[in-house]
Amino acid sequence: MSNPFDRVVCGDFAGPNGCPRRRGRQTYTRFQTLELEKEFHFNHYLTRRRRIEIAHALCLTERQIKIWFQNRRMKLKKELRAVKEINEQARREREEQDKMKNDSLKSAQQHHNSQKQQEQTIVGSQQSSGGGGGGGGGGGSSSLGSHLHHPSIVAQNDLKLGLGSMGVGVGVGGNLSMMGGLDNKTNQDILKARGSLVRESFFTVNETILRLRWTTREYVIVALFYPVAASSLLLKFRD
């Protein structure tokens, strides 16, 4: 088993023509490399005293320790430069992607605005073309609204209807009274029919008055034509 502190050292042997032979490249064992990396992790530069201690511990010369640290610092600078270039390239790519994204968003917004403007133009043209028909139909709606906003007209119509039914009841009663030649049973049936007609007419007018909101003038008109219904309405208002 080989000793981890073994090292290869090339001696200075005389070359051809008496020239000194060039020293070969120093090879480090795994243990030596790990110890040097550990020391470089904490200190990138070593003092002369620390170089002597490490050289004695790893069975290396002080010059070998110095050269190894110089090479390691150069390697670290190259690594940092490569990382910086990679980060710069990533930043440029990210900026390009953001720019493309912003351009796509702007184009989509412009397309949406153009579509919205076209829709508004179409709706405006349709409204302008349909304005004549809407104006023609406005007369019927206005007449209906005016009729609805004048409840007195409706009240007068209902009043005429109630009085008309009352007149029908009275007329029927007068015609029935002229039929004196009938027998008593027939006269009783006729009187019952007459009373029912009068009551129905009375309730019709009374309900009409209660259903509507009468003014003082309309109430006076009802009192003149039908005093019984007016008195009944007055009693209900007092209650």
UniProtKB/Swiss-Prot annotation:
Annotated region Disordered: where?
90-148
Q: Which SUPFAM superfamilies match?
A: Homeodomain-like
Q: Where is the composition biased (Basic and acidic residues)?
A: 90-104
State any GO CC term: nucleus
- A Pfam family of this chain: Homeodomain
Could you tell me which InterPro entries the record lists for this protein? Answer: Abdominal-A, Antp_homeobox, HD, HD_metazoa, Homeobox_CS, Homeodomain-like_sf
- Compositional bias segments (type: Gly residues): 129-142
Protein origin, superkingdom: Eukaryota
- Could you tell me which PROSITE patterns the record lists for this protein? HOMEOBOX_1 (PS00027), HOMEOBOX_2 (PS50071)
Principal subcellular localization: nucleus
Alphabetically sorted, this entry's keywords are: Developmental protein, DNA-binding, Homeobox, Nucleus
Where located? Nucleus
> Where does this protein bind DNA?
21-80
GO BP field: anterior/posterior pattern specification; negative regulation of transcription by RNA polymerase II; regulation of DNA-templated transcription
Is Nucleus given among the entry's keywords? Answer: yes
Ranges of Low complexity composition bias in the record = 106-128
Q: Which GO terms describe its molecular function?
A: DNA-binding transcription factor activity; DNA-binding transcription factor activity, RNA polymerase II-specific; RNA polymerase II cis-regulatory region sequence-specific DNA binding
Q: Which family does it belong to?
A: Belongs to the Antp homeobox family.
What exactly does this protein do?
Sequence-specific transcription factor which is part of a developmental regulatory system that provides cells with specific positional identities on the anterior-posterior axis.
State the protein's name.
Answer: Homeobox protein abdominal-A homolog
- Source organism of this protein record: Aedes aegypti (Yellowfever mosquito)
